[in-house]
C-alpha cells in the first residue's frame, strides 16, 4: 500500500489546507501574480445542504449592500448594479466567460460552498492581473465577482425588483429523492421570486444533464404566468446558451462523458396591466 493510501482523510485535508495557505501567502508576497489557483486544493462535495445553517454575511436590504470590495474598479457613485447572476456558479466557468462578453455589465457568481467560492475568488484575482499585465480582454475581468451565499434564502437581501437582466441555473443539485424535491432551485415559489428580480424581457436560463430535473424545471416555469419559454430558434441564436452549454465545468464534464444536456430558457414577460 502506498504512503498516500495509508493517510487518513483528515491528514490529507490538513495537508491540502496547508498547501492552500502557502499559496495564499506567496500571492500576498507577490510571488504568484497571475497564477491561476489549483483546483485540486479547493475540492469539496458536489452540493451543499441549503437548509443547514452556514456562517454567511448578508445585508438587511439591497440598499445596504456595499459592492465596492467586489468590483473595486467600478465607480460606486455611478450607482452601477449587478445585472447578471450565475446561481450556484461552482468553479466559475460561466461567470468568467460572461465577463468579456458583457464588459460593461456587472456579473456575479453566487456559490454556497466555501472552498469552491474561495477558488473562484482567487481565479478572478489572477485573471484580473493577467488582463492588466499580459493578455488584455474586454472588461479585464473587473466586472465579474463571486459571493458565497445561500441563494435559496437570501436573494431578496441583495437584489431589487427588476434589477437583473439574466439569471443562470446551470447543472443544479437534482435532489433525486421525492422528499427532497422541495429543496430544488426551481419551484413555484422560487419562480415567483426570480420573476420579481428579473426585469421585463430579461432571461432565465436553465441547463442540466438530468432529464427528470429538466422536465421538473420546465413544468414549473411553463406554468408561471410571467415566463415565456424560448423557441428552439431563440435558444440557438442566444450566445448565452452557447456559453452555459460549453463553458461550465459540469458542461465540459458531461461532454467528455458523452452525456446529454437539456436546456430551457425563459423570457420574463411584462406584468399584465
UniProtKB/Swiss-Prot annotation:
UniProt-listed Pfam families: Methyltransf_4
EC number, UniProt record: 2.1.1.33
Binding sites annotated in the UniProt record for S-adenosyl-L-methionine: 88, 111-112, 150-151, 170, 248-250
Top-tier EC class: transferase
Entry GO terms, CC: nucleolus; nucleus; tRNA (m7G46) methyltransferase complex; tRNA methyltransferase complex
Coiled coil: none
Subcellular location: Nucleus
Annotated InterPro entries: SAM-dependent_MTases_sf, Trm8_euk, tRNA_(Gua-N-7)_MeTrfase_Trmb
Record key words, sorted: Methyltransferase, Nucleus, RNA-binding, S-adenosyl-L-methionine, Transferase, tRNA processing, tRNA-binding
A GO molecular-function descriptor: tRNA (guanine(46)-N7)-methyltransferase activity
Catalysed reactions listed for this entry: guanosine(46) in tRNA + S-adenosyl-L-methionine = N(7)-methylguanosine(46) in tRNA + S-adenosyl-L-homocysteine
GO annotation terms (biological process): RNA (guanine-N7)-methylation; tRNA (guanine-N7)-methylation; tRNA methylation; tRNA modification
Similarity comment: family membership: Belongs to the class I-like SAM-binding methyltransferase superfamily. TrmB family.
Record text on subunit structure and interactions: Forms a complex with trm82.
Entry function: Catalyzes the formation of N(7)-methylguanine at position 46 (m7G46) in tRNA.
Protein's UniProt name: tRNA (guanine-N(7)-)-methyltransferase
Originating organism: Schizosaccharomyces pombe (strain 972 / ATCC 24843)
Name of the gene encoding the protein in the UniProt record: trm8
